[in-house]
From Swiss-Prot:
Its EC number is 1.11.1.24. Induction: Up-regulated by high-intensity light and H2O2. Down-regulated in the late stationary growth phase as compared to the early stationary and exponential growth phases. Homodimer; disulfide-linked, upon oxidation. Keywords: Chloroplast, Disulfide bond, Oxidoreductase, Plastid. Residues 3-161 form the Thioredoxin domain. InterPro entries: AhpC/TSA (IPR000866), Peroxiredoxin (IPR050217), Peroxiredoxin_AhpC-typ (IPR024706), Peroxiredoxin_C (IPR019479), Thioredoxin-like_sf (IPR036249), Thioredoxin_domain (IPR013766). It comes from Chattonella marina var. antiqua. GO terms for molecular function: thioredoxin peroxidase activity. This is 2-cysteine peroxiredoxin, chloroplastic.
Length: 195
């Protein structure tokens, strides 16, 4: 199944680890009032993955201020997730996280988002899902390099701005407070004349 921006995000129910406990997560429970940053990573106890997972946790408050939940997903079991969160960061673990890690042991979530490799691990994919459950943004990195949390936040802010201001669009490198433009031949000239 191919999944694209503008389509409904595949719902899922799965076991997750949060606050050193197991719980059930359903994507649709997060929607209606909040956006969701759903990111996939290859495996627990690896090398690039903890740098991304902890970076999202360290910046979680900024996502929360934007009415956004963060969910991390890998094909590991909830037991593996729990063990990894019980190891401190300086020893290659995750320590306490501000958001749940979802277990996709059966690889159903990774498959439904079309991010599963032939080797059976998820690529470094990130989806920003709006309150209506529509995928507004997706990126997929290969396994050997991590994502940019600043860019995820900036993209989220641009999505929210454009949804709140449907008569405007956000040009390259847009950040809150930057100029936007009207998406028409006359209105866009105001933007281009100012740069």
């Amino acid at each position: 199944m191919s999944i694209r921006v503008g389509q409904k995000a595949p719902d899922f129910t799965a076991t997750a680890v949060f606050d050193q406990e197991f719980g059930t997560i359903r994507l649709s429970d997060y929607l209606d009032k909040r956006y969701v940053v759903l990111f996939f990573y290859p495996l627990d106890f690896t090398f690039v993955c903890p740098t991304e997972i902890t970076a999202f946790s360290d910046r979680f408050k900024e996502f929360k201020e934007l009415s956004t939940e963060v969910l991390g997903v890998s094909v590991d079991s909830e037991f593996s997730h729990l063990a990894w969160t019980q190891i401190d960061r300086k020893s290659g673990g995750l320590g306490e996280l501000e958001y749940p890690l979802v277990s996709d042991l059966k690889k159903e979530i990774s498959s439904s988002y079309n991010v599963l490799t032939e080797d059976g691990v998820a690529l470094r994919a990130l989806f920003i899902i709006d309150k209506e459950g529509i995928i507004q943004h997706s990126t997929v990195n290969n396994l050997s390099f991590g994502r940019n949390v600043d860019e995820a936040l900036r993209t989220l802010q641009a999505i929210q701005y454009s949804q709140e201001n449907p008569d405007e669009v956000c040009p390259v490198n847009w950040k809150p407070g930057s100029k936007t433009m009207k998406p028409d031949p006359v209105g866009s000239k105001v933007y281009f004349e100012a740069i």
